Structures are given as structure tokens and as C-alpha cells.
């Protein structure tokens, strides 16, 4: 009876857990699979959108792109070279696609959906303007969209976001740790009111403050630089981290601190050698929060940074990879996958500390 009772319990648990996991993980699956799909497959709505396809749903031929001769090209033997990152254009309509053909016996891959190649019309052959001289087969799945990111400032944006996040973490920890300890342990008039006021400042929407902050960074002449973000982000990471760490410091038994003081330690030595090792999970939790918030923040980065090279990753992706109402979904999803890796790594390496820190800080 006990065995079947446990089986029913597991089945019930998984019956609720599996739909939740599917709902939570589906956006990540969709982003990953989209980032590896060729454009031809990505916009072929007749195919299964949840996996890769090799052939066009209408023609049942492999996905390809036609290579055409520009109208200005002379009628002469052609040595056709495709440069890295160039996009080819189809000369036919979707209703009447031309058959796939190769030039000679060459297997030609697209520099957009494959590797860099060159195409040469056989000696003596001529091609009229706007003639289709060949096709390039489209690889699917493909790493084209990831290669395309190398031709954009994507990795520069990643560097700016990482440097900003690291600097904000350092400033937040250096200020929030002593502030939280002082409010939690030292007795002075108004410390409770100050603690509540610090937390209430976190509840103010950051979007309300970006206009006065823009005047502030302009007065310091750090606008359009990474320093405008490094000085702004701590204003909404420090209040929450201070409030969070106050709970950790209050959870440390006072007897430990009193014994350290009796042994001759100063207040700073006691904080550094005794208290901080005990509340390290809370400090890591605060650091993760500060890094995640600054790495993903959008409004301040869009307002303070105007140059392409100094943009943060969220702003750069949304501004540079969207043209009006045209969305380059392949590169967008590839950048989303790569852009999420730093946060995934940070959470993955410190997941136990983060869960312990959030639960302990909330309870204490």
C-alpha cells in the first residue's frame, strides 16, 4: 500500500511539474532553435515551427538562394565572388521558383548560411544582366546568425555590460555591507526610520528618476560614457541590497561579536573576520541581484548612451538589429542566447547560495 501511495504521489507531482517546466522552458527552446534556423526555414510557415526543415513546403526542393547578375554587369565571362556577410537576392517569385542548378560540379555554400565561397562561370560562358547564374544551397541548421554577430558590435556591447555589471557589484557591496551592518547592529537615534526609508526608496520606479539623473550625469560630463551607468545603477541596487543584508546581520548571534571584541578585535576586524564569513550567502545574493539588474537594465542605457560602441547589450540588440518594423529574428535570437549566458553562468555557479540567501534574508 505504501509503495503505490508513493507512486501516486510521484505521478501527481510530475503531473503538475511537467506543464510548469514546459511553460517555463519553452521560450528558451524557441530562442535556441530559432537562432540556428536558416531564414528560408524561419519564414516558411507551412513547415513544423518546432524543428528544422530541409526543403521548401511548396516546391519540395532544398532551400536555396538564387545568384543573379546585376543589371550593370557587362555580357562577358564572369568571375563571381561573394564577400563574407553579403546577402544574395532571389530573381524569381515564390509562385514560380526556378529549379536548383549548380555551376559546373561545384557544391557552393552561401556565405550567409554557410561558408565563404566563390563561384566561377565556366570559361567562354556568358550571362546576360539579371540572369540567374546559379544557386547557393542553404544549410539548415546553420550557425549563420552567430557568425553575423561577429560583424556587429555585439561583443563590444557584451564587454560594456559585463564591465558595468562588475563595477556596480563592487560599489554596491562596498556601500551596502557597512550600511546594513550599522543599521542592524549599531544603536543610534533614527536607525529604524533610516532602514525603512532606504527600502522605500527602492520602491520608487527607476523610470521616474532618469530625467533628473540625465541632468546629473550631464553636469559631471560623463554622459555617453560607461560612467553614467556605473554612477546611476547603484542608486537602485544599494537600497535593496542594504535592506536584504540587514536581515542577515540581525541573524548573527551577538555572542559571537561580543567574544571577538573581548579577544581584542576592533569593530572592523570583527566585521571582516567574523561576521562577513557568516553572512557570505547574503552578500553573494546581493551581488547576484546587483549584477543581474545592471546587466539587463534598458531605460537608463537607452537614455544616457547614444554612441553605438558604448551601448549596453540590451540596448544595442534592440536598436541596431531592428529596422523600423523589420525584425531580424535569427540574429536577435542568437544575440539573446549569447546575451543570457553570463546571467545563466552566475546563477548556475551560485544557485545554492542564492536560494539560501533569499530565503534566509526574507525570514530573518
Name the predicted role of every residue range:
Residues 2-93, 98-364:
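A structural signal for multi-pass alpha-helical bundles of membrane permease subunits
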Amino acid at each position: 500500500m505504501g509503495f503505490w501511495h508513493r507512486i501516486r504521489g510521484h505521478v501527481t507531482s510530475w503531473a503538475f511539474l511537467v506543464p510548469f517546466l514546459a511553460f517555463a522552458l519553452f521560450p528558451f527552446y524557441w530562442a535556441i532553435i530559432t537562432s540556428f534556423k536558416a531564414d528560408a526555414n524561419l519564414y516558411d510557415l507551412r513547415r513544423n515551427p518546432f524543428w528544422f526543415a530541409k526543403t521548401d513546403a511548396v516546391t519540395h526542393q532544398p532551400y536555396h538562394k538564387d545568384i543573379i547578375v546585376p543589371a550593370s554587369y557587362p555580357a562577358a565571362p564572369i568571375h563571381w565572388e561573394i564577400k563574407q556577410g553579403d546577402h544574395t537576392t532571389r530573381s524569381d517569385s515564390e509562385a514560380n521558383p526556378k529549379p536548383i542548378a549548380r555551376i559546373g560540379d561545384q557544391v557552393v555554400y552561401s556565405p550567409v548560411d554557410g561558408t565563404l565561397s566563390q563561384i566561377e562561370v565556366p570559361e567562354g560562358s556568358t550571362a546576360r544582366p539579371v540572369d540567374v547564374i546559379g544557386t547557393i544551397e542553404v544549410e539548415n541548421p546553420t550557425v549563420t546568425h552567430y557568425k553575423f554577430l561577429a560583424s556587429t558590435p555585439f561583443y563590444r556591447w557584451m564587454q560594456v555590460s559585463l564591465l558595468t555589471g562588475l563595477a556596480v557589484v563592487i560599489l554596491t557591496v562596498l556601500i551596502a555591507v557597512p550600511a546594513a551592518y550599522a543599521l542592524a547592529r549599531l544603536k543610534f537615534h533614527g536607525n529604524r526610520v533610516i532602514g525603512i526609508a532606504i527600502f522605500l526608496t527602492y520602491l520608487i520606479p527607476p523610470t521616474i528618476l532618469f530625467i533628473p539623473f540625465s541632468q546629473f550625469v550631464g553636469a559631471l560630463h560623463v554622459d555617453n560614457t560607461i560612467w553614467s551607468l556605473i554612477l546611476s545603477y547603484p542608486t537602485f541596487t544599494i537600497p535593496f541590497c542594504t535592506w536584504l543584508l540587514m536581515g542577515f546581520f540581525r541573524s548573527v548571534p551577538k555572542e559571537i561579536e561580543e567574544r571577538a571584541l573581548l579577544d581584542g578585535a576592533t569593530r572592523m576586524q570583527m566585521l571582516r573576520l567574523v561576521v562577513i564569513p557568516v553572512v557570505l550567502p547574503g552578500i553573494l545574493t546581493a551581488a547576484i541581484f546587483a549584477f543581474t539588474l545592471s546587466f539587463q537594465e534598458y531605460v537608463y542605457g537607452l537614455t544616457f548612451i547614444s554612441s553605438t560602441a558604448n551601448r549596453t547589450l540590451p540596448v544595442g540588440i534592440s536598436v541596431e538589429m531592428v529596422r523600423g518594423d523589420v525584425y531580424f529574428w535569427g540574429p536577435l535570437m542568437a544575440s539573446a542566447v549569447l546575451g543570457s549566458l553570463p546571467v545563466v553562468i552566475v546563477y548556475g555557479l551560485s544557485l545554492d547560495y542564492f536560494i539560501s540567501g533569499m530565503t534566509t534574508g526574507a525570514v530573518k
